A protein has these predicted regions:
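Conserved GNAT acetyl-CoA-binding A-motif
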Residues: 232-245
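A short beta-loop-alpha structural element at the N-terminal edge
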Residues: 128-139
Length: 304
């Protein structure tokens, strides 16, 4: 049966509730015109609001996961679209390339519900910590924050600028096997830290950091390894591995604080493996650890 035969037209006035958080999911909606607000309330009562417009699908998250709806969808203007049930959704996900795109959308829409954590770095600058989101690759490449060729060389161990495909990969994560924290100035990323789980040993994950030149020397790298450690503990990662250029002294100093023992892998390249630091060993206040743990758990449990 063709997909078109399994969906029905929907027309809704502004202010109409189309889906309710917590209710059983029996349908999804493909928006053809208009827009809707997506409101999620987490277990702590914190509200997050997103938006869906023409060309987007809503309601697919609960259908894909076989769980109650995680958000309330309310039209913000007159809306037209197509509504389908489980059978229609099953047909849709069988279309080539649809399922991977849906999964990416689901993961990143859920991550967008997470409230950024305000942080203050060594010199008093106020920044925000949050999971990586769609568009961060574009904001990193084309935003007002600059990353010098030397900074990129230390991060990627090559003189060539990272390709668009690599930048896309770095921003497309599952938050479980590939988790990324981003520090922003309120708009563009100024730093990121990630762990990528070893497929042969899920208890081990490789870590990497990038800090924009104008923000180096402010303790952001030290803060990020602490934030990454909290997330890793939530996610069941027990050891961090690192591979870097031997002259990357800032990174080496950070890792040395947690007992790194370095081995030479190649000319100018060194590696180490450390135990993921425990909360009591991190230079973070109890409240900050609690906030980071809460956000990490939210994104890992909801998105992974």
């Amino acid at each position: 049966m063709p997909l078109a035969a399994t969906v029905e037209p929907l027309r809704a006035a502004a202010g109409q509730v189309l889906m309710q958080q917590g209710e059983r999911a029996i349908s999804f909606l493909l928006i053809s015109s208009g827009s809707a607000e997506i409101r999620h309330v987490d277990r702590d009562g914190v509200e997050s609001v997103g938006r869906a417009s023409a060309g987007e699908i809503v309601g697919e998250i609960a259908l894909l996961r076989g769980m109650p709806r995680i958000a309330t969808v309310t039209t913000t203007e007159p809306l037209d679209g197509w509504i389908g049930d489980n059978d229609a959704f099953t047909l849709m996900v069988q279309i080539p390339e649809v399922m991977p795109r849906l999964v990416r959308t689901i993961r990143q829409r859920l991550a967008a519900f997470i409230t950024p954590i305000p942080i203050q770095v060594r010199d008093g600058t106020d920044l925000l910590l949050r999971p990586v989101l769609p568009g961060d690759d574009e904001r990193t490449v084309h935003g007002h924050i600059k990353f010098s060729s030397e900074t990129l060389y230390r991060r990627f161990m090559t003189a060539r600028a990272p390709t668009p495909a690599l930048m896309h990969y770095l921003a497309e994560v599952d938050y479980v096997d590939h988790f990324v924290w981003v520090v922003t100035d309120g708009s563009d990323p100024v730093a990121d830290a990630r762990f990528v789980r070893d497929p042969n040993d899920p208890a081990v994950a490789e870590i990497a950091f990038t800090v924009a030149d104008a923000y180096q020397g402010r303790g952001i790298g030290s803060f990020l390894i602490a934030a990454l450690s909290v997330a890793a503990r939530v996610d069941g990662v027990e050891k961090f591995s690192a591979r870097m250029l031997s002259d990357n002294l800032p990174m080496r100093i950070i890792m040395d604080q947690y007992g790194a023992v370095w081995e030479r892998e190649d000319v100018g390249v060194i590696t180490t493996v450390i135990d993921v630091p425990r909360s009591r060993d991190l230079h973070l206040g109890r409240d900050m650890v609690s906030q980071i743990k809460r956000v990490a758990r939210q994104v890992i449990e909801a998105v992974g």
